[in-house]
From Swiss-Prot:
The gene is gpdA. It comes from Emericella nidulans (strain FGSC A4 / ATCC 38163 / CBS 112.46 / NRRL 194 / M139). The active site is at C151 (nucleophile). NAD(+) binds at R12, I13, D34, R79, N315. D-glyceraldehyde 3-phosphate binds at S150, C151, T152, T181, T210, G211, R233. GO terms for molecular function: glyceraldehyde-3-phosphate dehydrogenase (NAD+) (phosphorylating) activity; NAD binding; NADP binding. This is Glyceraldehyde-3-phosphate dehydrogenase. It catalyses: D-glyceraldehyde 3-phosphate + phosphate + NAD(+) = (2R)-3-phospho-glyceroyl phosphate + NADH + H(+).
Length: 336
């Protein structure tokens, strides 16, 4: 039986997790909570999406929530996660996608309402992080609060794993060329902690920080301290790309790297890591469900130990599909 899921926070990721849950069919969303959205407005936001198009199905409202494809889904407007009656709705696995409750202590408030597990759809300072295809098999059923890491870590980690497993990584630097997100500004505005981040998203390339590369060391312990990186926020609305430059332990040709990535993409990382030799651009991957799509033509080797690798990701859709996959996976472990 599909695990019953509740979603807290019906913003970009919350809504796209919802769409992916329906598309994948492996989890059953039974309830949603968002204190800032009324039910009829939630229906509108779910139906129409500027990036991913109209919802393919039917959406109606009733006095207690939404009716999606004929199925009732309770909608709550609680500000405090502890007050959301997940237990009454039968929701066991909660997607914490507000971006606010990202620590174990804050996210565990959901357990008070009857939930069994909480998956944070963001990096966490203290909750264990899992990346599907990389370290999900280290999950133990006594873990109650966990993180699906970030979209960028989900792109970088599978690629880094393949390179490290086959050729060894001495050290590496990553740049993610990242589409703008909701935290950025439409026009110049105040941003006290990040002055550059307060500048207009649609007309600037904005250097920014990211913890995504360092986080790889948490999901692949042998790479701890060997990777770091930064971001360039660019004027595109979705789909980002990781540029990973690594020094390898073993001498390697670029063709050998391509072969290793292609093999992994067709076997143990199928559906998570992709491989393409097509001349693609970012919009070609809008709506792609994979975490990381290796661009064989875009990378380059300086010598046999120093290589630049390029991998794309739909930072909304692909990441949200992994949230669904992680819940599907841990529910099977929990049932054993």
């Amino acid at each position: 039986m599909a695990p019953k899921v509740g979603i807290n926070g019906f913003g970009r990721i919350g809504r796209i997790v919802f769409r992916n849950a329906i598309e994948a069919g492996t989890v059953d969303v039974v309830a949603v909570n968002d204190p800032f959205i009324e039910t009829h407005y939630a229906a509108y936001m779910l139906k129409y999406d500027s990036q991913h198009g109209q919802f393919k199905g039917t959406i109606e409202t009733y006095d207690e929530g939404l009716i999606v494809n004929g199925k009732k889904i309770r909608f709550h407007t609680e500000r405090d996660p502890a007050n959301i009656p997940w237990g009454q709705d039968g929701a066991e696995y909660i997607v914490e996608s507000t971006g606010v409750f990202t620590t174990q202590e804050k996210a565990s408030a959901h357990l008070k309402g009857g939930a069994k597990k909480v998956v944070i759809s963001a990096p966490s300072a203290d909750a264990p992080m899992f990346v599907m295809g990389v370290n999900n098999e280290t999950y133990k059923k006594d873990i109650q609060v966990l993180s699906n890491a970030s979209c960028t870590t989900n792109c970088l980690a599978p690629l880094a794993k393949v390179i490290n497993d086959n050729f060894g990584i001495i050290e590496g630097l990553m740049t993610t060329v990242h589409s703008y997100t909701a935290t950025q500004k439409v026009v110049d505005g105040p941003s006290a902690k990040d002055w550059r981040g307060g500048r207009t998203a649609a007309t600037n390339i904005i250097p920014s920080s990211t913890g995504a590369a360092k986080a790889v060391g948490k999901v692949i312990p042998s790479l701890n301290g060997k990777l770091t990186g930064m971001a360039m926020r660019v004027p595109t609305s979705n789909v980002s790309v990781v540029d990973l430059t690594v020094r390898t332990e073993k001498a390697v040709t670029y063709d050998q790297i391509k072969d290793a990535v292609k093999k992994a993409s067709e076997n143990e990382l199928k559906g998570i890591l992709g491989y393409t030799e097509d001349d693609i651009v970012s919009t070609d991957l809008n709506g792609d469900t994979r975490s990381s799509i290796f661009d064989a033509k875009a990378g380059i080797a300086l010598n046999s130990n120093f290589i630049k690798l390029v991998s794309w990701y739909d930072n909304e859709w692909g990441y949200s599909r992994r949230v669904v996959d992680l819940i599907t996976y841990i529910s099977k472990v929990d049932a054993q």
